């Protein structure tokens, strides 16, 4: 049976250390929710206009919405009255569906080549739309929409290594509620307090703890950050660098599946990555 491919992304609303005095102190989940409900619009210099609509909630914090663009296009039509073929200027509005979970900032973007060549293009437009939201503007939040990489290849190399000599991971300001307590969560607070957008921390040693490195690597992937390491793959071998890389994690869902079912599959796949 044919299916639709959904790509996993993480949206972050990173609040500044000093919030505007006249605006309520909203959580990232609340900012996410308000931004969706505003149904913002985005005009590009190319003349195309992007929209967010068709918002449907499954509960208070999960649901789906449509994102698409409107452009002027020339349609070739047959005019029965004149008996001639004519060119008629009309609007074209391709769109795709996105399922979401505001609790953890999780997105599942449906692939649709008629709208964009890849999910990354759609993700950039989602970020642009959220940046136009009055709630985002008033809170001064920075919006990030990044794909969730599959960490399994990286983790397999970590598990099989003779020794882990160094480990490096990036972090951003606080947002993900499920960030690990050891690395991502405290460093994200540090980034916010010092006024940094992003940061990276590298640790080195003769043989780093494999279980801790694996745990932080999973959290790093789930929060849409990046990681790298230097390992000795086998005894007597030279140190080599490895990186967590690849495309967004994706799932294929049957065409007749409801959007609730789609979100459930997205959440299950996210849990696999998070570990």
Residue ranges and their predicted role:
Residues 1-77, 84-86, 114-275:
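Terminal interaction module
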Residues 82-92:
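Short, solvent-exposed beta-alpha or beta-beta edge segments that form flexible loop/patches at the rim
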Residues 92-98:
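Short, charged beta->alpha transition segments
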Residues 95, 106, 166:
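Broad gene-expression machinery/nucleic-acid interaction feature
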Residues 99-110:
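Glycine-rich, often proline-containing surface loops adjacent to acidic residues and nearby aromatics
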């Amino acid at each position: 049976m044919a299916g639709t491919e959904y790509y996993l992304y993480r949206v972050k609303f990173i609040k500044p250390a000093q919030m505007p005095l006249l605006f309520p102190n909203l959580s990232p989940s609340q900012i996410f929710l308000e931004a969706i409900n505003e149904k913002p619009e985005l005009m590009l210099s190319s003349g195309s206009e992007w929209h967010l609509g068709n918002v449907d909630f499954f509960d208070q914090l999960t649901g789906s919405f449509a994102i698409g663009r409107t452009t002027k296009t020339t349609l070739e039509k047959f005019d029965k009255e004149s008996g001639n073929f004519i060119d008629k200027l009309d609007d074209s509005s391709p769109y795709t569906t996105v399922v979401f979970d505001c609790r953890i900032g999780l997105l599942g973007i449906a692939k649709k080549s008629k709208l964009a060549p890849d999910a990354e293009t759609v993700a950039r437009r989602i970020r642009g739309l959220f940046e136009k939201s009055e709630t985002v503007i008033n809170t001064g939040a920075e919006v990030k929409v990044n794909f969730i990489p599959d960490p399994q290849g990286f983790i397999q190399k970590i598990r099989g290594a003779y020794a882990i000599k160094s480990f490096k991971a990036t972090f951003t300001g606080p947002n993900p509620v499920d960030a690990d307590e050891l690395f991502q969560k405290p460093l994200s607070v540090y980034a916010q307090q010092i006024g940094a957008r992003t940061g990276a921390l590298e640790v080195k040693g003769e043989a780093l703890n494999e279980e801790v490195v694996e745990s932080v690597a999973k959290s790093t992937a789930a929060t849409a950050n990046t990681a790298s390491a230097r390992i000795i793959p086998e005894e007597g071998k030279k140190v080599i660098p490895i990186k967590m890389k690849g495309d967004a994690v994706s799932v294929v869902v049957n065409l007749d599946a409801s959007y609730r079912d789609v979100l459930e599959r997205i959440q299950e796949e996210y849990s696999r990555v998070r570990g």
